[in-house]
Amino acid sequence: MNSVDAAGLGIGDGHPPRIMGVLNVSEESPYDPSVYDDPAEAARYVDEELIDEGADIVDVGLESANKRFDVLTAEEELDRLDVAIETIERVASDAVFSIETRYAEVADAALARGFDMVNDICGFADPAMAETCSEHDVAVVKMASPPDLGRPGAVEEVDWASRKSPEWAADAEYVDKLLAALAEAPLTEKTIVDPAFGGWSETKTLANDRETFDRLADFRELDRPVLVSINRKNFLGELVGRETDERLAASLGATALAVDRGADVIRTHDVAATRDAALIGDAFGRRRD
């Protein structure tokens, strides 16, 4: 089942790589061009800078996932949801709208009010998330994470000796831990998996992300489409010695490689250029072999 229907949008085998553009209604978010708190301005940005430039999906974040900031409660996210709802109601163009949240309560409210899918960076740490998405019959992105709402992506900090076995923990590579985290909670029929690129914890290393790139095809063994979020990430900056606003070229190179190695969805702030890079990776890469 390496394909999923997301509100009529086919994702995975038999479909072109899909582009997920980003809108943040959170002032804490690290990339300023995507941050809006006025629904009219946000809707204009979505229409002109995301959908018109080639975004198939618009992912709306209610808070920054940056570990430097405190995690919002579900109630605090719900307080910001009205801006997100009013924004998508004002958008004139067609797209699939995704709500980024770790809370099933927030996902349920967003889906009931017009959102089409969920992006869960905590990988079903909220035990009600999978059931909520199944009840709404929507696609959901599950990022590789420990079962902890406060530590998205921090799979290397899990006590794997206790969760699996001391022998498994001693032999496991970083990607083995990502795959184990994704497999721990049941995947819904419409789950898309995310291998958690980027600096999600203090112990995450550049070597970890290199290993993930090298083994990206392994995530297809989960029999689900794969989403990668690599746009302007710090690990790319480390490789090329560039700050965030100078990392577009590095991001595009990584995008083509990711699609070549099996990625089905690319999450990005730079929609038009990322779309082009993804199409090149698709046309000349190995993902269709």
Label every model-predicted segment.
Residues 1-10:
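Short coil-to-helix leader/linker segments, especially the first N-terminal amphipathic alpha-helix
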Residues 6, 14, 18, 27-32, ...:
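Active-site-adjacent loop and "lid" segments of alpha/beta metabolic enzymes
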Residues 44-61, 258:
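Catalytic domains of carbohydrate-active enzymes, especially glycoside hydrolases
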Residues 48-49, 84-91, 107-113, 173-185:
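An active-site-proximal structural segment forming one wall of the substrate-binding cleft
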Residues 51-52, 111-112, 129-138, 183-187:
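Acidic (Asp/Glu)-rich catalytic clusters
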